[in-house]
């Protein structure tokens, strides 16, 4: 039995965690196929997963996740305090250490601190990027489609790592998409940013991260409010008859 299954069944957990409720055994009689058995077991395991996080928090009052993962929220209001050089260096190192397809590391970054340029970049989309007007630092994330066909995944991972590192430093962040978006005049957002910053055409503008000191904190999402129903075990559940596609 795999370790994660043991953990959700109540075996092999760390000290101080109380026992989960009794795992309901699966009916493996001859009239049940292997797939049905796996689905039944998966349903019971999912019930355990849904309650595990809440039970652990009630027991210890401390999140089991890394604090930055547990507490990170998108922040759109910042105070006008510049980041230190050390903070910026740590953020960039986090981005450079992100996983990369075939270890190519083709993602590039442009740091923007000039207020006038941040104001202009805030109009790269019809809506949803105005928070760039008040942020002390913007990081433009660039991908290289010619060098790496998985550039979108690489750029996404780099941006996510920077956001988590920002949270770990007590900073706030928010992601503003550029790739696949448009300005209010119908121009591609990536083209708009490219023209402003002189970005060569072999690079693609993926997003801009707003990084700064938070004007206020947002509370972490309660564990029970997470969409645990999006998790499935072994295979996707069968559709209900009402959900069956029309022929």
Question: What function would you assign to each model-found segment?
Answer:
Residues 9-10, 198:
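Short, flexible coil/linker elements and helix-boundary hinge sites characteristic
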Residues 10-16:
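Residue-identity detector for glycine
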Residues 16, 23-247:
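Acidic, surface-exposed loops and disordered segments
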């Amino acid at each position: 039995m795999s370790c994660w299954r043991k953990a959700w069944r109540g075996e092999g957990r760390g000290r101080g965690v109380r026992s989960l409720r009794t795992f309901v055994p699966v009916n493996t009689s001859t009239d049940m196929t292997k797939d049905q058995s796996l689905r039944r077991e998966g349903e019971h395991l999912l019930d355990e997963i849904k309650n595990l996080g809440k039970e652990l928090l009630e027991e210890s009052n401390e999140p089991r996740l890394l604090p930055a993962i547990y507490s990170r929220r998108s922040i759109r209001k910042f105070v006008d305090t510049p980041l230190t050089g050390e903070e910026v260096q740590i953020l960039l190192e986090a981005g450079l250490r992100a996983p990369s397809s075939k270890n190519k590391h083709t993602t590039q970054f442009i740091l923007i601190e000039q207020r006038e340029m941040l104001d202009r970049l805030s109009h790269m989309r019809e809506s949803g990027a105005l928070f760039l007007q008040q942020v002390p630092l913007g990081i433009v994330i660039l991908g290289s489609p010619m060098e790496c066909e998985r550039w979108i995944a690489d750029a996404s991972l780099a941006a996510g790592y920077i956001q988590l590192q920002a949270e770990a430093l007590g900073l706030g962040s928010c992601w503003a998409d550029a790739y696949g978006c448009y300005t209010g005049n119908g121009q591609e957002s990536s083209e708009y940013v490219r023209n402003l910053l002189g970005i060569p055409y072999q690079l693609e503008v993926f997003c801009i991260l707003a990084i700064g000191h938070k004007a206020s904190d947002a509370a972490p999402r309660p564990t029970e409010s997470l969409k645990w129903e999006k998790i499935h075990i072994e295979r996707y559940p069968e559709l209900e008859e009402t959900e069956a596609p029309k022929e």
